[in-house]
Swiss-Prot record:
It comes from the Bacteria. This is UPF0502 protein PA3453. Belongs to the UPF0502 family. SUPFAM superfamilies: Winged helix' DNA-binding domain. InterPro entries: DUF480 (IPR007432), WH-like_DNA-bd_sf (IPR036388), WH_DNA-bd_sf (IPR036390). Transmembrane segments: none annotated.
Amino acid sequence: MSTEPNSPFVDDPLSAVDARILGSLVEKQATTPETYPLTLNALVLACNQKTSRDPVMNLTPGQVGQSLRQLEGRGLVRLVMGSRADRWEHTLGKGLELVAPQVALLGLLFLRGPQTLNELLTRSNRLHDFDDVEQIRHHLERLAGRGLAVHLERRAGQREERYMHLLGSQADLEAAVEAMGSDPERAAPAALSADAEARIAELETRLAALEERLARLEGGA
């Protein structure tokens, strides 16, 4: 791991649940703007998606709700009051003074852990239109300069270097690096093409919207 400035989150790190929530909000803002901001139920489903998530989680509404309240207190999410349901949106750009490309990259790192430049280029196609890996490297180095991301040197058996976010606890970050080292190329998360993952994620989002609509209808019956 290269030497970088200390993370501003070192004394009050994000939990794994916090990171999953923020990453999910960043993703859905870009991929399903018609349903964003998200209701609590929609956010739980987004956090627990089987695609584009590493690791896959099984969070409860209670866990997500508690984390949202903590993130709101830190100025990283905002509650949007609605006539039918309250909704949540992230405020990473304002809260951390980030430009859109940096928000997109942090979102991906929150959702999938350490990743190569090529992985980030492929997986970011629905979040931000990056020209090439060098543009991604530029924004990652800007994040690293503020202690929000770090460059990981290539390890034995790996073909490419990786980057990871630095907003989590030391234990979580070490676990992510260890998991990366135990299976250098981590074939399973990359087994699906980016297009296939996008289609599956879109179907999961549509299903979540239908379930939410059904719940509202049943509640009004």
